[in-house]
Amino acid sequence: MVFATLGSVHPAQDIPFESPRDGWYGLKTLWFVAPSYQGPVLVRGARIDTEGAMAFGESPALGELIIPPGPTLNEASDGYRTAPGGTYVHDPGCYAWQVDGIGFSTHIVFSATTV
């Protein structure tokens, strides 16, 4: 389950991680960027209750997610920019995304649970 603050950038919520594939549990992650913020976004993450990695992308290949400034290919009609992708972890547990943009940095803590 994801507990997100509704700031400038946030993911979709309440989605369980899918069964492991190649040692990674995957979560389809759709990021929303508020119309009031048009700058770049950097998303990183890690497990916070013990050691553990997090990866991003369509497969667990990236150590971070970058949402470029300006319009996205699939911008919503209400002006929100969206960035689809995935978040991957090795084990269920407590994790956090760190979301950075120009003038802000926030942490979003979530519990990675399985289906």
Give a label for each model feature.
Residues 1-90, 94, 100-101, 105-115:
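Contiguous segments within soluble domain cores/interaction surfaces
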